[in-house]
Amino acid sequence: MKVTVGPDPSLVYRPDVDPEMAKDKASFRNYTSGPLLDRVFTTYKLMHTHQTVDFVRSKHAQFGGFSYKKMTVMEAVDLLDGLVDESDPDVDFPNSFHAFQTAEGIRKAHPDKDWFHLVGLLHDLGKVLALFGEPQWAVVGDTFPVGCRPQASVVFCDSTFQDNPDLQDPRYSTELGMYQPHCGLDRVLMSWGHDEYMYQVMKFNKFSLPPEAFYMIRFHSFYPWHTGSDYQQLCSQQDLAMLPWVQEFNKFDLYTKCPDLPDVDKLRPYYQGLIDKYCPGILSW
Protein backbone atom coordinates (compact mmCIF):
# COMPACT_ATOMS: atom_id res chain seq x y z
CA MET A 1 0.00 0.00 0.00
CA LYS A 2 1.28 3.45 -0.92
CA VAL A 3 0.61 6.29 1.52
CA THR A 4 0.98 9.89 0.41
CA VAL A 5 2.64 12.21 2.90
CA GLY A 6 3.31 14.95 0.37
CA PRO A 7 6.41 17.13 0.43
CA ASP A 8 8.14 17.55 3.76
CA PRO A 9 7.85 21.32 4.22
CA SER A 10 11.09 21.35 6.21
CA LEU A 11 12.94 20.32 3.07
CA VAL A 12 11.14 22.27 0.36
CA TYR A 13 10.43 25.65 1.91
CA ARG A 14 13.24 27.32 3.78
CA PRO A 15 12.74 31.10 4.05
CA ASP A 16 15.24 31.39 6.89
CA VAL A 17 18.36 29.78 5.44
CA ASP A 18 21.35 32.04 4.90
CA PRO A 19 21.49 32.87 1.15
CA GLU A 20 25.26 32.35 1.20
CA MET A 21 24.70 28.75 2.27
CA ALA A 22 22.20 28.29 -0.52
CA LYS A 23 24.54 29.10 -3.43
CA ASP A 24 24.55 26.25 -5.93
CA LYS A 25 21.99 24.48 -3.74
CA ALA A 26 18.87 26.40 -4.76
CA SER A 27 17.35 23.38 -6.46
CA PHE A 28 16.84 21.72 -3.08
CA ARG A 29 14.27 24.32 -2.00
CA ASN A 30 13.47 26.38 -5.07
CA TYR A 31 9.80 26.80 -4.19
CA THR A 32 8.74 30.42 -3.83
CA SER A 33 5.37 30.51 -5.56
CA GLY A 34 2.69 28.41 -7.21
CA PRO A 35 0.74 25.33 -6.16
CA LEU A 36 3.49 23.72 -4.07
CA LEU A 37 3.83 26.78 -1.87
CA ASP A 38 0.05 26.83 -1.48
CA ARG A 39 0.13 23.21 -0.34
CA VAL A 40 2.96 23.88 2.09
CA PHE A 41 1.08 26.87 3.51
CA THR A 42 -2.02 24.71 3.99
CA THR A 43 0.06 22.09 5.82
CA TYR A 44 1.42 24.70 8.20
CA LYS A 45 -2.00 26.27 8.68
CA LEU A 46 -3.40 22.92 9.79
CA MET A 47 -0.34 22.23 11.93
CA HIS A 48 -0.37 25.61 13.63
CA THR A 49 -4.10 25.36 14.28
CA HIS A 50 -4.22 21.85 15.73
CA GLN A 51 -0.83 21.34 17.40
CA THR A 52 -1.80 22.29 20.95
CA VAL A 53 -0.69 21.14 24.39
CA ASP A 54 -3.71 18.84 24.64
CA PHE A 55 -3.18 17.44 21.14
CA VAL A 56 0.49 16.66 21.73
CA ARG A 57 -0.23 15.03 25.07
CA SER A 58 -2.91 12.91 23.42
CA LYS A 59 -0.40 11.71 20.80
CA HIS A 60 2.12 10.79 23.48
CA ALA A 61 -0.62 8.76 25.15
CA GLN A 62 -1.71 7.19 21.84
CA PHE A 63 1.75 6.16 20.67
CA GLY A 64 3.54 5.91 24.01
CA GLY A 65 2.68 2.24 24.40
CA PHE A 66 4.71 1.42 21.27
CA SER A 67 2.19 -1.24 20.31
CA TYR A 68 1.60 -0.34 16.66
CA LYS A 69 4.21 -2.58 15.08
CA LYS A 70 7.12 -4.89 15.85
CA MET A 71 9.96 -4.59 13.36
CA THR A 72 13.70 -4.11 12.97
CA VAL A 73 15.31 -0.83 11.98
CA MET A 74 16.03 -2.12 8.48
CA GLU A 75 12.40 -3.18 8.07
CA ALA A 76 11.39 0.37 9.01
CA VAL A 77 13.82 1.75 6.42
CA ASP A 78 12.17 -0.44 3.80
CA LEU A 79 8.73 0.77 4.91
CA LEU A 80 9.73 4.29 3.87
CA ASP A 81 9.36 3.07 0.30
CA GLY A 82 5.61 3.02 0.91
CA LEU A 83 5.60 6.78 1.44
CA VAL A 84 5.01 8.80 -1.71
CA ASP A 85 6.28 12.38 -2.06
CA GLU A 86 3.53 13.80 -4.25
CA SER A 87 5.59 16.91 -5.00
CA ASP A 88 8.02 14.92 -7.16
CA PRO A 89 5.93 13.13 -9.81
CA ASP A 90 8.88 12.89 -12.20
CA VAL A 91 11.36 11.46 -9.69
CA ASP A 92 10.86 7.75 -9.34
CA PHE A 93 13.08 6.43 -6.58
CA PRO A 94 12.31 5.11 -3.09
CA ASN A 95 12.16 7.41 -0.09
CA SER A 96 14.58 5.11 1.70
CA PHE A 97 17.31 6.29 -0.68
CA HIS A 98 17.33 9.66 1.10
CA ALA A 99 18.15 7.85 4.34
CA PHE A 100 21.14 6.14 2.73
CA GLN A 101 22.20 9.34 0.93
CA THR A 102 22.17 11.27 4.20
CA ALA A 103 24.05 8.52 6.00
CA GLU A 104 26.68 8.26 3.28
CA GLY A 105 27.19 12.04 3.23
CA ILE A 106 27.87 11.94 6.96
CA ARG A 107 30.10 8.88 6.60
CA LYS A 108 32.25 10.66 4.03
CA ALA A 109 32.66 13.78 6.18
CA HIS A 110 32.96 11.98 9.54
CA PRO A 111 34.49 8.57 8.81
CA ASP A 112 35.45 7.97 12.44
CA LYS A 113 31.96 8.45 13.92
CA ASP A 114 29.97 5.35 13.01
CA TRP A 115 27.12 6.33 15.37
CA PHE A 116 26.70 9.55 13.34
CA HIS A 117 26.41 7.51 10.13
CA LEU A 118 23.58 5.56 11.73
CA VAL A 119 21.77 8.78 12.68
CA GLY A 120 21.61 9.60 8.97
CA LEU A 121 19.84 6.32 8.33
CA LEU A 122 17.49 6.69 11.30
CA HIS A 123 16.48 10.33 11.10
CA ASP A 124 13.29 10.04 9.03
CA LEU A 125 12.06 6.66 10.25
CA GLY A 126 9.44 8.38 12.37
CA LYS A 127 7.58 9.08 9.14
CA VAL A 128 6.16 5.58 9.45
CA LEU A 129 3.53 7.49 11.47
CA ALA A 130 1.87 8.10 8.10
CA LEU A 131 1.43 4.35 7.73
CA PHE A 132 -0.39 4.37 11.07
CA GLY A 133 -2.92 6.85 9.69
CA GLU A 134 -1.49 10.16 10.91
CA PRO A 135 -2.16 13.26 8.75
CA GLN A 136 0.75 15.04 7.08
CA TRP A 137 0.67 18.00 9.47
CA ALA A 138 1.26 15.58 12.37
CA VAL A 139 4.18 13.83 10.64
CA VAL A 140 6.36 16.27 8.68
CA GLY A 141 7.35 19.93 8.69
CA ASP A 142 9.21 22.24 11.04
CA THR A 143 8.64 21.64 14.74
CA PHE A 144 8.17 24.12 17.58
CA PRO A 145 7.40 24.06 21.32
CA VAL A 146 3.75 24.02 22.30
CA GLY A 147 2.67 25.65 25.54
CA CYS A 148 4.22 29.04 24.81
CA ARG A 149 3.83 31.80 22.24
CA PRO A 150 5.38 30.94 18.85
CA GLN A 151 8.44 32.99 18.03
CA ALA A 152 9.16 35.03 14.93
CA SER A 153 11.19 32.49 12.96
CA VAL A 154 8.45 29.83 13.01
CA VAL A 155 7.45 29.44 9.35
CA PHE A 156 4.34 31.50 8.48
CA CYS A 157 4.17 32.55 12.13
CA ASP A 158 2.13 35.70 11.45
CA SER A 159 -0.53 34.06 9.31
CA THR A 160 -1.22 30.53 10.57
CA PHE A 161 -1.77 30.57 14.35
CA GLN A 162 -4.95 32.66 14.54
CA ASP A 163 -7.18 29.64 15.18
CA ASN A 164 -4.91 27.87 17.66
CA PRO A 165 -6.85 27.79 20.95
CA ASP A 166 -3.70 27.78 23.08
CA LEU A 167 -2.96 31.36 22.04
CA GLN A 168 -6.22 32.40 23.69
CA ASP A 169 -5.17 30.66 26.91
CA PRO A 170 -3.14 32.91 29.25
CA ARG A 171 -1.21 29.86 30.49
CA TYR A 172 0.26 29.26 27.05
CA SER A 173 0.28 32.62 25.25
CA THR A 174 3.33 34.33 26.76
CA GLU A 175 6.95 34.00 25.69
CA LEU A 176 7.65 31.45 28.43
CA GLY A 177 4.13 30.06 28.66
CA MET A 178 4.07 27.00 30.90
CA TYR A 179 7.86 26.78 31.17
CA GLN A 180 10.51 28.15 33.52
CA PRO A 181 13.39 30.23 32.12
CA HIS A 182 16.18 28.01 30.77
CA CYS A 183 14.35 24.87 31.88
CA GLY A 184 16.03 22.87 29.13
CA LEU A 185 14.56 21.45 25.95
CA ASP A 186 14.26 18.04 27.58
CA ARG A 187 11.44 19.57 29.66
CA VAL A 188 9.74 21.19 26.68
CA LEU A 189 6.72 19.66 24.93
CA MET A 190 7.51 19.76 21.22
CA SER A 191 4.91 19.70 18.45
CA TRP A 192 4.08 16.14 17.41
CA GLY A 193 5.72 14.67 14.33
CA HIS A 194 8.30 12.23 13.07
CA ASP A 195 11.16 13.79 15.08
CA GLU A 196 9.47 13.44 18.46
CA TYR A 197 8.06 10.01 17.67
CA MET A 198 11.43 8.58 16.59
CA TYR A 199 13.12 10.11 19.63
CA GLN A 200 10.59 8.37 21.86
CA VAL A 201 11.07 5.08 19.96
CA MET A 202 14.82 5.34 20.54
CA LYS A 203 14.38 5.97 24.26
CA PHE A 204 11.82 3.19 24.72
CA ASN A 205 13.96 0.64 22.88
CA LYS A 206 17.14 1.81 24.65
CA PHE A 207 19.29 2.65 21.63
CA SER A 208 22.90 2.73 22.85
CA LEU A 209 23.74 5.94 20.98
CA PRO A 210 25.41 9.03 22.48
CA PRO A 211 23.34 12.03 23.62
CA GLU A 212 24.28 13.92 20.46
CA ALA A 213 22.37 11.36 18.40
CA PHE A 214 19.20 11.79 20.43
CA TYR A 215 19.41 15.57 20.03
CA MET A 216 19.88 15.27 16.27
CA ILE A 217 16.85 13.03 15.90
CA ARG A 218 14.56 15.01 18.19
CA PHE A 219 15.45 18.48 16.95
CA HIS A 220 16.51 18.19 13.30
CA SER A 221 13.22 19.80 12.20
CA PHE A 222 13.32 22.45 14.96
CA TYR A 223 14.44 25.15 12.50
CA PRO A 224 13.28 28.06 14.68
CA TRP A 225 15.97 26.95 17.15
CA HIS A 226 18.90 25.58 15.17
CA THR A 227 18.58 28.03 12.26
CA GLY A 228 16.36 30.85 13.53
CA SER A 229 18.15 31.20 16.91
CA ASP A 230 14.81 31.53 18.70
CA TYR A 231 13.61 29.92 21.93
CA GLN A 232 16.86 30.75 23.71
CA GLN A 233 14.82 31.50 26.83
CA LEU A 234 14.04 27.79 27.14
CA CYS A 235 17.55 26.47 26.52
CA SER A 236 19.91 25.05 29.11
CA GLN A 237 23.68 25.03 28.79
CA GLN A 238 23.39 21.40 27.68
CA ASP A 239 21.12 22.43 24.80
CA LEU A 240 23.56 25.11 23.66
CA ALA A 241 26.42 22.62 23.82
CA MET A 242 24.46 20.21 21.60
CA LEU A 243 23.31 22.85 19.11
CA PRO A 244 26.41 22.61 16.84
CA TRP A 245 25.82 18.88 16.45
CA VAL A 246 22.23 19.44 15.33
CA GLN A 247 23.42 22.11 12.90
CA GLU A 248 26.11 19.80 11.54
CA PHE A 249 23.56 17.06 10.93
CA ASN A 250 21.20 19.48 9.18
CA LYS A 251 23.74 20.14 6.43
CA PHE A 252 23.59 16.52 5.35
CA ASP A 253 19.82 16.21 5.71
CA LEU A 254 19.20 19.10 3.33
CA TYR A 255 21.94 18.78 0.78
CA THR A 256 22.59 15.10 0.10
CA LYS A 257 19.58 14.53 -2.15
CA CYS A 258 20.84 14.02 -5.69
CA PRO A 259 20.04 11.95 -8.78
CA ASP A 260 23.10 9.75 -8.22
CA LEU A 261 21.45 7.03 -6.20
CA PRO A 262 23.52 4.91 -3.81
CA ASP A 263 23.87 1.19 -4.36
CA VAL A 264 21.73 0.23 -1.39
CA ASP A 265 22.45 -3.49 -1.68
CA LYS A 266 26.17 -2.82 -1.26
CA LEU A 267 25.58 -0.46 1.67
CA ARG A 268 23.17 -2.64 3.63
CA PRO A 269 25.80 -4.89 5.28
CA TYR A 270 27.69 -1.89 6.69
CA TYR A 271 24.56 -0.27 8.11
CA GLN A 272 23.20 -3.59 9.35
CA GLY A 273 26.42 -3.87 11.34
CA LEU A 274 25.75 -0.46 12.91
CA ILE A 275 22.17 -1.46 13.69
CA ASP A 276 23.42 -4.65 15.34
CA LYS A 277 25.84 -2.55 17.40
CA TYR A 278 23.51 0.23 18.56
CA CYS A 279 19.88 -0.88 18.16
CA PRO A 280 19.65 -4.60 17.39
CA GLY A 281 16.73 -6.93 17.02
CA ILE A 282 13.00 -6.49 16.71
CA LEU A 283 11.87 -3.16 18.17
CA SER A 284 8.55 -1.84 19.44
CA TRP A 285 7.05 1.01 17.40
From Swiss-Prot:
Subcellular location: Cytoplasm
GO CC term (a single one): cytoplasm
Reactions catalysed according to its record: myo-inositol + O2 = D-glucuronate + H2O + H(+)
SUPFAM superfamilies: HD-domain/PDEase-like
Record bears the keyword Phosphoprotein: yes
An example Gene Ontology molecular-function term: ferric iron binding
Cysteine disulfide links: none
Binding site for substrate: 29, 85-87, 127, 141-142, 220-221
Pathway membership: Polyol metabolism; myo-inositol degradation into D-glucuronate; D-glucuronate from myo-inositol: step 1/1
Binding site for Fe cation 1: 98, 123-124, 253
Residues binding Fe cation 2: 124, 194, 220
Annotated InterPro entries: Inositol_oxygenase (IPR007828)
Similarity field: Belongs to the myo-inositol oxygenase family.
Protein name: Inositol oxygenase
